């Protein structure tokens, strides 16, 4: 079963993306942050 999670920017801590995940480990993805206006590492938030 897939869990719904939100991804937050590692610099400004803004929650920019919502997605589903099916793996047990925490997600870390490089995505564009519209607040920072650059591509940053986004981490899974509970």
Swiss-Prot record:
Pfam family, one: Ribosomal_L33
One GO term (biological process): translation
Disulfide bonds: none
GO function terms (MF aspect): structural constituent of ribosome
Superkingdom of origin organism: Bacteria
Entries under SUPFAM superfamilies matching the protein: Zn-binding ribosomal proteins
UniProt keyword Ribonucleoprotein present: yes
One Gene Ontology CC term in the entry: ribonucleoprotein complex
Protein keywords: Ribonucleoprotein, Ribosomal protein
Coiled-coil spans in chain: none
Keyword Ribonucleoprotein: yes
Matches recorded under InterPro entries: Ribosomal_bL33, Ribosomal_bL33_sf, Ribosomal_zn-bd
Family that this chain belongs to: Belongs to the bacterial ribosomal protein bL33 family.
Protein name: Large ribosomal subunit protein bL33A
